[in-house]
């Protein structure tokens, strides 16, 4: 991305990152990922409970002191929880999960924690050539290409957060030899 309004810094040292933020005075900072950031003043490896806690605390203090919005990205494990210490979830104002399947172009943004708003909302997006685009009508997307009166199918309304979504349900039933 070539833009005079975007600065990318490849840095894992907390002190160097904070110095760059103070020098550049950005409106928004994105840290990807907090598990790779380390404070050299601590005798623990990056990603440890103490490192994640101290690095997050330093970013929070800088953000609040300078009025900067900070997005802290954390890795998730196979179970879908934020990898490493749970302390990160308790420190931040909002926890969002960006979910998707590598075999489809659709992604869901789901709020798991929000100190300033609802957590029962989702956003559905599609990865396109221009980037992520909102899917304004998920029901239409889920039902597109569905033949009318297809045997063994029906449309069901399910709630995804506070949003009703229409989806196709399929079932095949056959009689068995035992009746």
Report the location of each language-model feature.
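Conserved inter-motif catalytic segment of the P-loop NTP-binding fold
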Residues: 1-61, 176
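Short glycine-/polar-rich loops that comprise or flank the Walker A/P-loop
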Residues: 4, 67-68, 90-94, 105-107, ...
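Active-site phosphate-binding and catalytic loops of NTP-dependent enzymes
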Residues: 4-5, 64, 81, 98, ...
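Short, ordered loop/turn segments at secondary-structure junctions
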Residues: 12-14, 33-36, 42, 65-68, ...
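Short glycine-/acidic-enriched loop or helix-start segments at secondary-structure transitions
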Residues: 18, 40-41, 81-83, 107-108, ...
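Conserved P-loop NTPase
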Residues: 22-29, 35, 100-179
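Substrate-engagement module of ASCE P-loop NTPases
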Residues: 50-75, 91-102
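Short regulatory helix/loop adjacent to the ATP-binding pocket of P-loop NTPases
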Residues: 81-91
